[in-house]
C-alpha cells in the first residue's frame, strides 16, 4: 500500500512539473517574439542583439544604442559595453564594473580610467593644468 502512495505522489509531482514547464516555455516564447528585432533588443530579459536598447542578458547585450554585454552593459557604440553597468564601446562606456575602456567618458575597471576627465581649450589636460586654467580665468572675470 505504501508503494502505491509513493507511485501516485511521484506521478503527481511529474505531472505538475510538466504543466509548469509547458507554461514557462509558452511565456518565454511570447516574450522572445515581443523583444526580437531592431528596437528593444531580443534575447533574455530586456536584452538580446539588436540596434536600439540592447541585446544580451539582463538589460544588456551587443547592439548599437544603450547596450551590449551582461547586466546593464556590454559592448556597443553608445552608452554601453562590458559587464555590470559598463564595458567597452565608443561613448559613455568601457570595462568591467561601472567603467572600463572606450573613447568617450570611459576606460578602466571600477569607476573609470583611460578617459579624459579635464578639458583645457578643447583638449585633454591634467588636473593641475585644469586647476591652473580655472584660476587664471577666475582672475579675469569681472566682479559684480
UniProtKB/Swiss-Prot annotation:
Q: What are the alphabetically sorted keywords of the record?
A: Membrane, Repeat, Transmembrane, Transmembrane helix
Gene Ontology cellular-component terms for this entry are:
membrane
Primary localization class, coarse: membrane
Instruction: Name a Pfam family for this protein.
Output: GRP
Q: Name the family the entry cites.
A: Belongs to the GRP family.
- Compartment(s) where it occurs, according to its Swiss-Prot or TrEMBL record: Membrane
Copy out the induction comment. By light.
Membrane topology (UniProt): Single-pass membrane protein
Q: Which organism is it from?
A: Oxybasis rubra
Q: Where are the sequence repeats?
A: 37-42, 43-48, 50-55, 56-61, 63-68, 69-74, 76-81, 82-87, 89-94, 102-107, 108-113
Chain spans, region 11 X 6 AA tandem repeats of G-Y-[NH]-N-G -G: 37-113
Q: What InterPro entries does this protein's entry cite?
A: GRP (IPR010800)
Name this protein carries in UniProt:
Glycine-rich protein HC1
Q: Which PANTHER family match?
A: GLYCINE-RICH PROTEIN, NODULIN-24
Q: Which residues are listed as membrane-spanning?
A: 5-25
